Amino acid sequence: MPDLYIIGGPNGAGKTTTALRVFPRLGVSSFINADIIAQGMSPLDVESAARAAGRFMLQEMEAHLARGADFALETTLASRTLAPFVRRCQSAGYRFILIYVWLEDADLAVSRVARRVRAGGHNIPDEVVRRRYERGLKNFFEIYSPLADSWTVLDNTGKSAVFVAQGGRELATDVMLLETWQAMQGADND
């Protein structure tokens, strides 16, 4: 059974860093990431390559699905548009594994993106980071975690990520950090 891994979370949460550490340990060799693709297309002006990188990412996703190959991708989960693709993958026999990297608030996400920009990384406007933070968390609970065969939540607010909870469509939810889990659910209801 092929696997589709999605690592989601707000901008600045450390999704790419986490993915590059975790996916090799899971045996995942194909990580489709629009930001990395854009850096390869135009390393001196990543923002100008973002649209083309997004199109290339979609082509790669479809190609992996057509081959029945394992793959992973990164997203903020701020859009609902990925859900039909996930369902198509599941209909084709894929197992959907979701990893959500959480930050305690949108202010921290904005701060992390600003730090990334100072270090030479790509920028995302503050209002976009804030909007994606709220929508991504809402969509995690309402759309993507209910679809996931298994999901894991990591809190990357501190210096290193810690496990918060895990579960899945046919799995009981196991909460390791109750206060953090409740904070996530409360933030989703704001």
Residues of each region from the PLM?
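NTP-dependent small-molecule kinase module
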Residues: E142-D190
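Pre-Walker A (Motif I) flank of P-loop NTPase domains
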Residues: M1-L4, R67-A69
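Conserved lysine of the Walker
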Residues: K15
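Conserved substrate/cofactor phosphate-moiety recognition/catalytic segment
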Residues: A19-A69
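The Walker A (P-loop) glycine that initiates the GxxxxGKT/S ATP-binding motif of P-loop NTPases
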Residues: I6-G9, T75
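A glycine- and Lys/Arg-enriched "phosphate-lid" helix/loop adjacent to the NTP-binding pocket
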Residues: Y94-F140
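Glycine-rich phosphate-binding loop used to anchor ATP phosphates in small-molecule kinases
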Residues: A49-L103, G136, F140, T152
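Walker A (P-loop) phosphate-binding loop of P-loop NTPases
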Residues: G12
